[in-house]
Amino acid sequence: MLRHALLLPLLLGSSVAVAASDLPGQQGPTAALLQGGGLQLSTRRTAELFPDGNRIWKVELHRGPTLLASWPAASGVAGRQSADRRWSPGNAAPLPAGLYSLGRPEPWGNDLWFDLTPRFGTTRSALGIHRCYPGTGCICIPERADIDALARWVKASGIRSLKVVN
């Protein structure tokens, strides 16, 4: 039986997904992970859904092709995922795709807020990353431990941009 358990990863090859908890930067930066620069922060919609039907987004930290951390998030409410994302403020649509300037984490009540400033034309404003659920247009990270880990990365590495992929 042990032989089969050891062969399974070899047989499945790259189709085995890495659990977020296994990613080297999931809990925050280490001195070794901060070496080398070239960090990119992005977020993307997935095909996955939270139990209540809201779309799962992923906030991901990469160095080149290597995924260092991945945190589940939400943006927009379930019924508004295909609404106009660029020109209709207040419609609960997800964050528009594009490049954003990322502010440093700052206190927001008992939580954290990262300001997001679009680097493209849009009528959307007051955008950010914060802890909430469900999302109503910002990037909402439901778990406190996840937003705290992201804050440690942003503070320690100086990341100042976020790409919304899709």
Model-predicted segments: where are they?
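Generic detector of well-ordered secondary structure
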Residues: 12-13, 131, 140
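Active-site nucleophilic cysteine motif
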Residues: 135-143, 147
